[in-house]
Each structure stands twice: as structure tokens, then as C-alpha cells.
Swiss-Prot record:
Region of interest (Disordered), ranges: 18-47, 184-225
Localization terms from the record: Nucleus; Cytoplasm; Golgi apparatus
Name of the protein: Baculoviral IAP repeat-containing protein 7
Family, as annotated: Belongs to the IAP family.
Pfam families: BIR, zf-C3HC4_3
Encoding gene (name): Birc7
Entry-linked PROSITE patterns: BIR_REPEAT_1 (PS01282), BIR_REPEAT_2 (PS50143), ZF_RING_1 (PS00518), ZF_RING_2 (PS50089)
Comp. bias (Basic and acidic residues): 19-47
Amino acid sequence: MFSPADLFRAAVFSMGPESRARDSVRGPELSHREDGSGRTQEQDKPHCPCNHVLGQDCLDGQILGQLRPLSEEEESSGAAFLGEPAFPEMDSEDLRLASFYDWPSTAGIQPEPLAAAGFFHTGQQDKVRCFFCYGGLQSWERGDDPWTEHARWFPRCQFLLRSKGRDFVERIQTYTPLLGSWDQREEPEDAVSATPSAPAHGSPELLRSRRETQPEDVSEPGAKDVQEQLRQLQEERRCKVCLDRAVSIVFVPCGHFVCTECAPNLQLCPICRVPICSCVRTFLS
């Protein structure tokens, strides 16, 4: 069977629960069946003339818009080290990789290892966040290893511990310990956020510029309720056309979401009015 990523690269969107799909630009309908070996056979092949680079996936601008204005209060909401991911919408590595569609070409690292290590792009410069612990890093340099930096700065992340094991994390902590600490409430509003580079010896000021503020205990005064934030994100995932069903189709190139029932009837994005080149069915947890 074709995966959603395969259909996305082919500029094809789903037409429902049956094994049918349609090229959103030229319109020929596809169907497929499986033989005894489980292999899929195509009956028609569309030819999308879109100049958009389909290898660069798009994400919902509504959801990313919620992630961009990350204040210190939001970061101290306590989602980091709970047993559940802070942003389950990014649980899929494919969706995390899709968030790097506007990843700067000057960044010192490719998106694939970042997505594999649990990070998604926030849409700002080379800033990334872990979907599970909410830890953020930036200022990536050539030769940086995402797993190593994840273990260095956010060693209590459960996704990291399950993926790489406690021995790996302890080894990284032993060889590259964090030196110094600071009180988040004393940090200036315009402080530079994270970098995975090794911290300078014993300087809280330099450390402050090298890491996104690590979430603190949820009981700290002024901390926002994590569950309320997630509830608001769920509300953002409601289709803006019918205002009823949950979104499940993402438009290319704009990245906005609508539901499966509304998508086939649209030629322009109802949110930004950009012509729709293609659509892809998404599966959000």
C-alpha cells in the first residue's frame, strides 16, 4: 500500500476510505489493488505540472502559528517531563520532517536527523523543539548530532530515554556536563535562545544564550495550564469551512488544513485564498 508520504510526493489526495485518490491539479482518478504478494498496482498515473517542490512538505499554518510566539511563561508550563508528549500532533516522524519545509539552507544540519531525534521546526530561523519534552535548540553547526544535543540539554525527556536508552544519556551527561545554571525569571525578554554548541565553562550568561529555557515545575506562579494549551490546539484543528469536522487534509503549498469532506470542493484555500496545487491526507493523533 502507498503511505501518506508517497501520495504527498505524488501530489495526490485521498477521496475517502476506499482505495481511490485524485491528482488535485490535473484531476485523473487513481485506484489501486493488491495482488497476492501485497504489492499495489496503479491503473492511471497523473501528471501534476506544479512547480512546487513536493519533496518539501507543508504543515498547518494554524498549528505552527500557535508554536511561534513562545514566551517564557509558556515554556515553564511543565509539559517537558510528563509521561505524555507535550505536542502529540508531532508524534509522527513524517509530520516532524514535514515541518522543515522552510528550513534555512544555511543551517549547519539537515532536517532528517533532527526529525528522527524528536525535533520539529518552529518556523523561525533554525529553532527546533522536541515534540515530547518541549525542549528547544537553535544555532546548529556542522557536525552537531541531534541525539547528543538532546541528551545534553534535556536528559529527562522520556522520548529520548526510550529511543536511546539511559546508558547513552548518562554517557553524554558524563562527558559533556552542563556547567552553571540561572533563574529563568531573571532572564531578559530578548535573550538569545538555544544552541547545541558546548557550553562555555561556568558562565551562566553564556549558558543563557545557548539553550531554550527549560520548562520548570508546573506549580511555579504564572505558569499556564498545559492542558488548556492543548485544548486550544485541538480547537484550532477544527475545519474552518464547515466548522464541524476535524481537519485531515493539508493543502500544498500554503499548509492550511480542512476536513476530508470539504477539500474536494475547493480550488482556492479558504483561509489564505492561495491556489491549491495539491492535497495530502494527514493522520493527526
